[in-house]
Amino acid sequence: MLTKSAENKRNRKDDSMRPGQQLTLSIDHQTDFGYFLTDGEDTILLHNSEMTEDIEDRDEVEVFIYVDQQERLAATMKIPIISADEYGWVEVVDKVEDMGVFVDVGLSKDALVATEHLPPYEDVWPQKGDKLYCMLKVTNRGRMFAKPAPEDIISELFTDASEDLMNKELTGTVYRLIASGSFVITDDGIRCFIHPSERKEEPRLGSRVTGRVIQVKEDGSVNLSLLPRKQDAMSVDAECILTYMRMRNGAMPYSDKSQPDDIRERFNMSKAAFKRALGHLMKNGKVYQENGWTYEKK
């Protein structure tokens, strides 16, 4: 059983200022480098650099408690844009190999999104300028971590897509990557899915992508494609073929009779796409075929 003095000491410890708290404190006294604030028991420094407005005529001030660069408990009037109870979009400011990415939460110190909350492959980790939907966790030692929202949390932002979005372009932020595809949320809350077959490469977590709606689903979400429309792709593929031919003095040992594997290895396109592009070039009088070769018309 605790003695009265031991119980008071425990209660005092429970009530003491800790990193991660948002408190309203009284102004104790001013110094050249800031103000000392108090909760009636302990004092803490609010440095001039951490003030967002003049508090000379005030008795109390709302602050966030954190551990500064010198590992000291300190106060700031800059309130973080996310908290343990509130998720929000935060911007990536740095990426550290084998450690994670740091995000700006509105304080002079950034919060870490650890590797356990990031994809297994670093090439699809967020880069500077990308955004993640996170909450804030502050340890007793003052380390700040940002944790991306799980599906059940981010689903609170979802809105239903309308049928008239079919074939329209949507832009959004990649918020989840799994083996079966990429999930995106638009600024107005439409949930989008990109199957691996509808992209040339996997987008980064937190990056902005623009895709074409290829299906509006019954649950209000949509499927997106990041691939160009066939007519646009044909133009790109045709230019690729012409560029290759011009590197070989206007001739290449490929035609619409070439093997699919040979075409894919050389041009990174399917035989169907190759034939469409080649047909487009022949129709427009750019090339002709002869004995299994294709030649550029001069």
Curated annotation (Swiss-Prot):
Annotated region described as Disordered, given as residue ranges: 1-22
Domain of life: Bacteria
InterPro entries per record: CvfB_fam, CvfB_S1_2nd, CvfB_S1_3rd, CvfB_S1_st, CvfB_WH, NA-bd_OB-fold, S1_domain, WH-like_DNA-bd_sf
Gene Ontology MF term list: nucleic acid binding
PROSITE patterns in alphabetical order: S1 (PS50126)
Start-end of Basic and acidic residues biased regions: 1-17
All residue ranges annotated as the S1 motif domain in the record: 167-227
Pfam family, one: CvfB_1st
Protein name per its UniProtKB record: Uncharacterized protein YitL
UniProt source species: Bacillus subtilis (strain 168)
Source organism phylogeny: Bacteria, Bacillati, Bacillota, Bacilli, Bacillales
Gene: yitL
